Amino acid sequence: MELVTILEKTVSPDRNELEAAQKFLEQAAVENLPTFVVELSKVLANPANSQVARVAAGLQIKNPLTSRDPDVKAQYQQRWLAIDASARGEIKTYVLRTLGTESYRPSSASQCVAGIACAEITVNQWPQLIPQLVANVTDPNSTERMKESTLEAIGYICQDIDPEQLQHKSNEILTAIIQGMRKEEPSNNVRLAATNALLNSLEFTKANFDKESERHYIMQVVCEATQCPDTRVRVAALQNLVKIMSLYYQYMETYMGPALFAITVEAMKNEIDEVALQGIEFWSNVCDEEMDLAIEASEAAEQGRPPEHTSKFYAKGALQYLVPILTQTLTKQDENDDDDDWNPCKAAGVCLMLLATCCEDDIVPHVLPFIKEHIKNPDWRYRDAAVMAFGCILEGPESCQLKPLVIQAMPTLIELMKDPSVVVRDTTAWTVGRICELLPEAAINDVYLAPLLQCLIEGLGAEPRVASNVCWAFSSLAEAAYEAADVADDQEEPSSYCLSSSFEVIVQKLLETTDRPDGHQNNLRSAAYEALMEIVKNSAKDCYPAVQKTTLVIMERLQQVLQVESHIQSTSDRIQFNDLQSLLCATLQNVLRKVQHQDALQISDVVMASLLRMFQSTAGSGGVQEDALMAVSTLVEVLGAEFLKYMEAFKPFLTIGLKNYAEYQVCLAAVGLVGDLCRALQSNILPFCDEMMQFLLENLGNENVHRSVKPQILSVFGDVALAIGGEFKKYLDVVLNTLQQASQAQVDKSDYDMVDYLNELREGCIEAYTGIIQGLKGDQENVHPDVMLVQPRVEFILSFIDHIAGDEDHTDSVVACGAGLIGDLCTAFGKDVLKLVEARPMIHELLTEGRRSKTNKTKTLATWATKELRKLKNQA
């Protein structure tokens, strides 16, 4: 069968034809990829073929070159480069020849060119491509289609390739793009393709922005494009301004007054949503930049140096113009608004919040008149906008300035919780939630707390969108009430607090809310469970009877849920069922933490039975397994040594968790649980250690185990050693060799994620060494001789700490662990340590840094280690 016919059948309505065509194409790609792609490129390049065939051919060429997964993409690119150079040359010729010949948009050829370019340019191949593309755009004889598809190709290349690969070509690329963007260009399609290409190229044109004359020209062309009658070009040009503001803030002063301010403020007022959104986004970005600069300025001041970059305070200067437009935009809400639709009204709310955080007290006088004028407006849109504006400015200004305003507004807000408009009630509930979170002392006052609680309790019965915000308000209120309560010096928790009298009713109402049939809407069910967790966690002693009742309700629900499991049919039911199991597990954790030890012993059999059943039934769902492991972990915490009786029954499921490489969160939870078991069971963990140590060591050596699990495993070795003391000797050699290997890991320092990982790995190593030394040393006055087994490694351990001290990327918590380990080495090995430390002056610098830390733990450990070293010095 002819290739063209098969390609046309890839869109056939007949399922059999479609599947046969796909199967043929897949087979052809496997049998002989080079020949297959050459044939496809001929189909693509031939204008006589149908549009369907050409587009399908383009997809078949492009798809084996690109993937969203960077690892797969790299494999694809290697596979392409392995194709014989002459075949690749032929394909590239046909693909380039296609540019400008397609009568459809977007161009398939431009995507193919970009796919090949990203594979070849990175290995210094296809040097003639960029000059060829530039010529296509700048040649006066080029057609509109040629220029448009070529600029699309340039845009795709800029979007997908590592910017460093194109820096040396930035002048040529920019020449082509600016040529296509100029107002003299007759075709708006060409201008659009060029403007989109510029957006993708901004990262690597820094050298051009650094030169004043080039920068002026780029800015002129972009500003002119924002005035294009074609909305698509206008939006793309504004997107460029938004991004330029982030990347090149320091250069914008010249353009802000004469151009950018007027362009963006006009855009904000535009009737067309896409245009208005970009105008608002521009000012949101200004706020983001200026907040970063404020942080930089305060850090520089702390260190007594001038900041590298300074803020020009554009946001503060523009407040009087921006706020009226934003508050007016807040009145354009859609009554049946879907949460997922991003529109100017939502963007205006976010921009107001950012302005409040950025400009602090200065925003209040600009927003307050609007709130006062409209909070009782007969038009619901204005009432809603006023409440929204109020909620938006609660974070940023000083609380002393906001608190009197909030207290004054409280009766009105309580009244608005009963507003006829659901939109107003929703926004009011959100605003009350923000007050509870950000200015709780205004909510927890003698005058308004009772009516506020009453209206919130009633609000739990409202529409899901309102009730969901009410749940969030309860979460914040519970935490604030607990923190505001008086606690006797010798007590951990308050005997009573301001929610005590309503506690039982609130809990009862929240439990009812979790059971609402419409609980899946607006995330209501999980919001209600989270509120329940917060309120139980933050309860006073006199609320304990209600906590006991809640515990029984949650246990009963868990049992009910497990009974329904066998009747589940559909996938959507299964998802809801798993979510419910996870929520119940999380709630169970919270109530267990509050339950007194005696009560915990009475219910632990039933709890454990439910959790074991859950492990049996949820082998397929990692999320639920993780939550169930966390619940077991809490039970271990509450029961302590009494958990031993469940170990035999639980061990198989712990093993499954430790072996779950595919879902690393489950594996992480299982590893963490091993540490909890060691702390709770102490030496009673011994009979289970051989097996657990075997799995942990296997995981460390296994390529398929996610890297984030490995630092935790190292740390758990320390927990095992602390629990079993001298019995750890049998694992000592293999563990010390593993630690020696792990502590020598190197990473790419330009990759922040890897730098974080390296710090975690080092912390894990130090925690392991600490646990081993403390475990073997014993906690008696006299050091147990077993610890001398570590003596040969002491020099290596100190060199490791010295190496960390010299690495400027070390974190505060690594300093804390390192200091603790130095102190332990001193107490275990005495004067030998002193000589080794003296030979490594960086260690003293590390301890000095620790003593100056803002974190108490780090300060305490560093001071202790310094004292231990001083003791040894005095003895010597």
UniProtKB/Swiss-Prot annotation:
Entry-linked InterPro entries: ARM-like, ARM-type_fold, Armadillo, HEAT_type_2, Importin-beta_N, Importin_beta
Family as reported in the entry's similarity comment: Belongs to the importin beta family. Importin beta-1 subfamily.
Quaternary data: Forms a complex with an importin alpha subunit.
Function: Required for nuclear protein import and mediates docking of import substrate to distinct nucleoporins.
Spans of repeat HEAT: 2-31, 33-65, 85-123, 129-160, 170-202, 212-247, 253-302, 314-360, 364-394, 402-438, 449-485, 500-537, 544-592, 600-639, 644-681, 686-724, 732-776, 786-829, 831-873
Region (IAB-binding): 329-342
GO biological process, one term: protein import into nucleus
Keywords: Cytoplasm, Nucleus, Protein transport, Repeat, Transport
Stretches for region Ran-GTP binding: 334-419
Subcellular location: Cytoplasm; Nucleus envelope
Name recorded for this polypeptide: Importin subunit beta
Pfam families linked to this entry: HEAT_EZ, IBN_N
Importin N-terminal domain: residues covered: 21-101
GO terms for cellular component: cytoplasm; cytosol; nuclear envelope; nucleus
Molecular function terms, GO-annotated: nuclear import signal receptor activity; nuclear localization sequence binding; small GTPase binding
